[in-house]
A protein has these predicted regions:
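Radical SAM enzyme [4Fe-4S]-AdoMet core and its adjacent flexible, acidic
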Residues: 2-103, 107
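Flexible mid-to-C-terminal extensions adjoining Fe-S/redox cofactors in radical SAM and related proteins
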Residues: 104-166
Length: 166
């Protein structure tokens, strides 16, 4: 069922301290038009570990970016430490210097080597059709990720950022 969590135990985010499996949540174009409402629905359902899976057309990179940035905007102000979103956790881990590549994953292709966000993505043999959307998300989330990385370096939890944004 799209737009609803699938009861699929997925991987745990780097540094995740509990055993809550990620819930796969399929994101379609209509969810991208109301990202705040969709995220509020997931919160209301009590999800605490989410893996967004885009089910979008190749030309929908801007929609994907809009969705990710809107959800991140709310999450960074209200839900750090309460709701674990896999993409956000992996992005923060990359900002903290952790390697995100999985064993056996294909190497980045030559079109990706010049990308300033290569260290954050898991591109494979070909560029993701939603790559522009991910890049826009990385641009948007970068300043917040930088602060959360610095908080971790100071032995403080990333959620210490939330009061600063209110």
């Amino acid at each position: 069922m799209t737009g609803c969590p699938a009861n699929l135990p997925l991987t745990h985010a780097p540094g995740q301290q509990h055993d809550t499996p990620f819930q796969a949540v399929v994101v379609e174009a209509h969810h991208c038009h109301q990202p705040q409402a969709f995220y509020a629905q997931l919160r209301q359902q009590g999800l605490t570990a989410i893996h967004f899976i885009p089910q979008l057309a190749a030309g929908d990179a801007a929609l994907w970016a809009e969705f990710l940035c809107a959800v991140f905007h709310r999450w960074v102000r209200e839900d750090i430490g309460r709701i674990n979103i896999l993409l956000f956790s992996e992005t923060l881990s990359a900002w903290c210097g952790e390697t995100l590549t999985q064993p056996g994953a294909p190497a980045a292709n030559s079109t990706c080597y010049g990308c300033p966000w290569l260290r954050l993505c898991r591109c494979g043999e070909q560029e993701d059709p939603l790559c522009a959307g991910y890049r826009q998300f990385y641009d948007f989330s970068g300043p917040y990720m930088r602060v959360m990385r610095d908080l971790r370096r100071q032995q403080r939890p990333p959620e210490a950022l939330m009061p600063l944004l209110r």
